[in-house]
Regions:
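PP2C/PPM-type serine/threonine phosphatase catalytic domain
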Residues: 1-176
Length: 179
C-alpha cells in the first residue's frame, strides 16, 4: 500500500464586499502529516444574523472524532439549530460546510452542503467534486445550508487521490471568481 505525506496551507480573509469575515476554516494553521488529515471550509451566510457564529460552530465539530465524514455535517447542523433555539438573535443564521477526510492510502471522503467547493488538481486536469446548491438564476441564494432545516441532503463522494494531486477547498467567492 502506497503511503502519502500530506502538506496543507490555509488562508482566510475578508473579501471586498463584507466588513467582517464570516468564513471559518479547519485546520487553522498550515502544517504536514504522514497520517490521515481532515479539513474543511465554512462560509457563514452573509446578510443573515450571526453567519460568523454559524461557521465557527461548524468548524469546531472538526475537533471531534467521527467514523463517518457525514457525522461532522449532521453534528454541526444540530449544534447550530440548538444555538438558534436558545438565542433569539441567532434565528436564521447558517453556513455552508465542505469537509474532507483523507486517509493514509489517499482515499478522500467528502461531505458537502451549500456552495463552497472542493477541487482536485491533478497533473492532467481539475475536477470539481462538489455541486453548488443555489436557487437557479440566483447564485447568492442557497437551497440549503447548515442551520436552515433539521434534515439536510448531504452530498457525499469518495475519490482516490494520486501522488502529487492537490485538494483545494474554497468558498463560493473564490470558486466563482478565480477557478
Amino acid at each position: 500500500m502506497k503511503k502519502y505525506k500530506f502538506i496543507w496551507t490555509v488562508k482566510s480573509e475578508c473579501g471586498p464586499v463584507r466588513k467582517k469575515n464570516e468564513d471559518s476554516i479547519f485546520p487553522l494553521e498550515s502544517g504536514s502529516s504522514k497520517t490521515s488529515i481532515k479539513a474543511g471550509v465554512f462560509d457563514g451566510m452573509g446578510g443573515h444574523k450571526k453567519g460568523e457564529v454559524a461557521s465557527d460552530l461548524a468548524s469546531k465539530t472538526m475537533h471531534r472524532d467521527f467514523d463517518s465524514i457525514t457525522d461532522y455535517v449532521k453534528t454541526a447542523n444540530r449544534d447550530i439549530l440548538e444555538y438558534q433555539s436558545s438565542n433569539d438573535d441567532a434565528k436564521g443564521m447558517g453556513t455552508t460546510m465542505t469537509v474532507v477526510k483523507i486517509s493514509q492510502d489517499g482515499t478522500l471522503s467528502l461531505a458537502h452542503v451549500g456552495d463552497s467547493r472542493c477541487y482536485v488538481l491533478s497533473s492532467r486536469n481539475m475536477i470539481q467534486l462538489t455541486e453548488d446548491e443555489n436557487v437557479p438564476g440566483y447564485q447568492n441564494v442557497l437551497t440549503q445550508a447548515l442551520g436552515s432545516k433539521e434534515k439536510l441532503t448531504i452530498q457525499n463522494k469518495d475519490f482516490q487521490l494520486s501522488s502529487g494531486d492537490v485538494v483545494f477547498l474554497c468558498t463560493d467567492e473564490i470558486g466563482r471568481a478565480h477557478v
